[in-house]
Amino acid sequence: MTSSTSPERADSAAPAENIHWRRNLAVCFAGSFSTIVAMTLLLPFLPLYVEELGVQGHAAIVQWSGVAYGATFFAAALVAPLWGRLGDRYGRKLMLVRASFGMAICMSLTGMVQSVWQLVLLRLLVGLAGGYASGSTILVAMQAPKARSGWALGVLSAGIMAGNLVGPLIGGALPPLIGIRATFLLAGGVIFLAFLATVFLIKEMPRPPKSATQDGKRRGGWAQIPDKRPVAAILATGMLLMFATMSIEPIITVYVGQLVEDPARVTLVSGVVMSAAALGAILSASRLGRLADRVGHWTVIVGALAVAALLLIPQAFVTAGWQLVALRFLMGLALGGLLPCVTSVIRHNVPDGVGGNVLGMSISAQYVGQVAGPLLGGFIGGHFGMPAVFLGTAVLLALGAAANGVLRARHQRRLAEA
């Protein structure tokens, strides 16, 4: 038994294994990749679109671009637990259908806005209505066999990260060819294809018996968890991971500017640095997931956090751009399987009937880290210097590894005594 598995069955009558889980995984992989590409391709030209909508002045353009981009994450963090709860009650496939259809409409309308306020409003609506990738994570986590959940979530995570990597590249190439507004319309069309694939190809397991559903209505999702301590610890770990990862993002370009002598190469090297971490994570996600299925998901979490903390220390003292690229790639390899392992630990420790609800909480916690990380990272980098961000983040990850190691050991003792 792995360290992440509860001694009790989370459900006394767990639903049978879904024979379509591999096909569902393939559709979720393709759908998550395509929707993430469509959502992130606006990054290279968002400031240009804001300027086209009438905003003038460099500071105002940067500010409105940040507001428009962050609005989606803010809204998504608010509603992720709600969609998870509704998915537990009415079906997780339905949540994917809702997300893909809503995102297709909102993304297409984004190409028709006439003011920056309309742009921000639609970006909020995308966050409220969207969540295809997070919904896919919940569906795969709940319907893949528990013994293969780490591998399946690693494959899905690789697709999501690949979408984040490819989206900005496509976004840099399309607007000069077809225009910014047409690019949004094309993105809406791509998401609509994901909607069609979801409707016709995903097969969900039957819903739980009526008595189990009624019990879920009487008791809150959190109240049904037999042992809340590992779940609470992993929720905090997911937030810590995103906080630590995103705290580096605001300073990468400025830091690279101190390492590269030619100003014309700063943007290129910064892009390579960011892509290196993503590429490493893509390559390692499914492999770390498969390893976690064998040795325990919590074990991999502790090890990956410790390795990442060690790799952050030399990043504070690099003297050339290639050194930073190499270290970020290695860090991506270490962190690639962490979020799938976080999801798997939750999956193994909550009842099937409330899994979506708790995984929705996990996604919200990660969004909080994703928003707070850049704010604190930028503040520390601006007031205490760039190396302080790397060293401070290393300390956070080391503390996270130590805390998870202690909690894992205590959890194993409780399992042995049960």
Predicted segments with their positions:
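Juxtamembrane intracellular "pre-TM" segments in multi-pass secondary transporters
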Residues: 7-22, 204-235, 418
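Short amphipathic helix-loop junctions that connect adjacent transmembrane helices
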Residues: 45-62, 251-268
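Central cavity-lining transmembrane alpha-helices of secondary-active solute carriers
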Residues: 67-83, 275-287
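Conserved MFS/SLC helix-loop-helix module at the cytosolic interface between two early adjacent transmembrane helices
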Residues: 77-114, 292-298
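Paired small-residue
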Residues: 106, 117-125, 311, 322-330
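Cytoplasmic helix-loop-helix junction between adjacent transmembrane helices
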Residues: 122-161, 344-345
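Symmetry-related core transmembrane helices of the 12-TM Major Facilitator Superfamily/SLC fold
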Residues: 182-200, 390-406
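Helix-loop junctions on the cytosolic side of multi-pass membrane transporters
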Residues: 195-212, 405-416
